[in-house]
Amino acid sequence: MPDYRSKTSTHGRNMAGARALWRATGMKDDDFKKPIIAIANSFTQFVPGHVHLKDLGQLVAREIERAGGVAKEFNTIAVDDGIAMGHDGMLYSLPSREIIADSVEYMVNAHCADAIVCISNCDKITPGMLMAALRLNIPVIFVSGGPMEAGKTKLASHGLDLVDAMVIAADSSASDEKVAEYERSACPTCGSCSGMFTANSMNCLTEALGLALPGNGSTLATHSDREQLFLQAGRTIVELCKRYYGENDESVLPRNIANFKAFENAMMLDIAMGGSTNTILHLLAAAQEAEIDFDLRDIDRLSRKVPQLCKVAPNIQKYHMEDVHRAGGIFSILGSLARGGLLHTDLPTVHSRSMEEAIAKWDITQTDDEAVHHFFKAGPAGIPTQTAFSQSTRWETLDDDRENGCIRSFEHAYSKEGGLAVLYGNIALDGCVVKTAGVDESIHVFEGNAKIFESQDSAVRGILADEVKEGDIVIIRYEGPKGGPGMQEMLYPTSYLKSKGLGKACALLTDGRFSGGTSGLSIGHASPEAAAGGAIGLVQDGDKVLIDIPNRSINLLISDEELAARRVEQDKKGWKPVEQRPRKVTTALKAYALLATSADKGAVRNKAMLDGL
């Protein structure tokens, strides 16, 4: 019998009590010779990306048991960022990532599980589970709930998503009837919101890291093809267990699959597809769990050489995740990166001996396999539903146009530089990030006057009251991991700027973060954050700020002497908002803030503070 981790709780005379409890869960004598595989599900009725997951854990469990394993399912929490947004609920979103990571660790280690199937989907759930998987370093596979279908309405010539509903609601010229129609049409099915927002970005990145099956990031939640991903995940995790515990093959462990080169692959994919800036935060956090020295400087280096090969909402209106799938999904983007000489193709995945082998099999421009072509023709049905695998609609043709299609070749890239950039300067010594894919080229260099807000709430009030004018740079501070606490997303301020016609006339800088639905000159993750003594806390109303994306710089245009003098004064006052914020910070949030690092470290816990405990 292989030397399973689970033997700790299933073998030996002294474990009679534990075995009695295992038997009470349904285990038989023969089961104690099999690997115990944890299924970390994240079903909840609060989140459309998770509302359809209830029965899918048991779908995987049955396949695991057919393949020779023992499956035990548990649940994590899942916060819906869209529902939590715009009020104090958003304070809990990023901290929930740590709770999810810890809960997976607690369950897996407490019960000595041998492997994990992570059933994730939305914004903080995939990152939290990824952090746990790399922390635990036992066989793992990710299978997400899948993206939502794009919304359809006769009032728009393009597909709709959540952001469209938010923008139209803030547009005073839009009728109540139009707002209501957008609201009812924007989110028609179960699944993660239909654009290249944080959830879908992270689920795509699990493919590039080698920890998920092809199609994980792009196959619609409603499509029957997605059922096969869950079934295959169940079979694959048992095979990974056999290789690790039975054959001592350590190459299947997540830290050996998702190594430094794999993180580079994931980041290159993110840059090439113009993914959410939140992915930077989460990849940095996951790298720390894997004990990989991967940081913002690496991301900055990659951003300068990776072109943008894919554009999806919110960066362009005509394409959503269903269109990415039709164009060949993530392995077609990875294939383009490989042919451009950028991708590390020698790395293993949970499903292939190497990324090169996987691309040869799954890139629709490289294979004649009809089954693969059939798979990527899976499309939307346009029928509102909360049921997984409820339709089998197919596109008549694939989008294999690499000159003008959704996914491009190197020669026909949307832009020579990718969709994300890291900026440095005296206002953000440790860096800040911008999704350049969503920024009009006319404002890649922007000088403006600082308009200071001490919270997201006051910024929203100011924007809606027309206090922000053309040429302003909105500064929202004390919204970082420690200062918020919780590093709120700023989708409402950016959406309201857009609705006021200021999307190309203003910029926004914050030590908070942005929804994956954000576009415009929106710069987040300013590090160090204001609450940690960052220079963003020293900016005053009317100060000139220069943003220069081509040169990767952002600077407050005052002398070093003036900046130093302001720091002396701020040290005396303390690094806290000038105005009192009507914000209820609970004990749970205070505990998070106590250990939180700034965004350049992934907003993870400050482990140095814990080392002596």
Swiss-Prot record:
| Keywords for this protein | 2Fe-2S, Amino-acid biosynthesis, Branched-chain amino acid biosynthesis, Iron, Iron-sulfur, Lyase, Magnesium, Metal-binding
NCBIfam families xref list: ilvD, PRK12448.1
Q: Which residues bind [2Fe-2S] cluster?
A: C122, C193
Q: Quick one: which pathway?
A: Amino-acid biosynthesis; L-isoleucine biosynthesis; L-isoleucine from 2-oxobutanoate: step 3/4; Amino-acid biosynthesis; L-valine biosynthesis; L-valine from pyruvate: step 3/4
Gene3D superfamilies the UniProt entry points to: IlvD/EDD C-terminal domain-like (3.50.30.80)
Quote the protein name from its UniProt record.
Answer: Dihydroxy-acid dehydratase
Pfam families assigned: ILV_EDD_C, ILVD_EDD_N
Question: What does it catalyze?
Answer: (2R)-2,3-dihydroxy-3-methylbutanoate = 3-methyl-2-oxobutanoate + H2O; (2R,3R)-2,3-dihydroxy-3-methylpentanoate = (S)-3-methyl-2-oxopentanoate + H2O
Q: Which of the seven top EC classes does this enzyme belong to?
A: lyase
Output the lineage of the source organism: Bacteria, Pseudomonadati, Pseudomonadota, Gammaproteobacteria, Pseudomonadales
What organism is this sequence from? Pseudomonas fluorescens (strain Pf0-1)
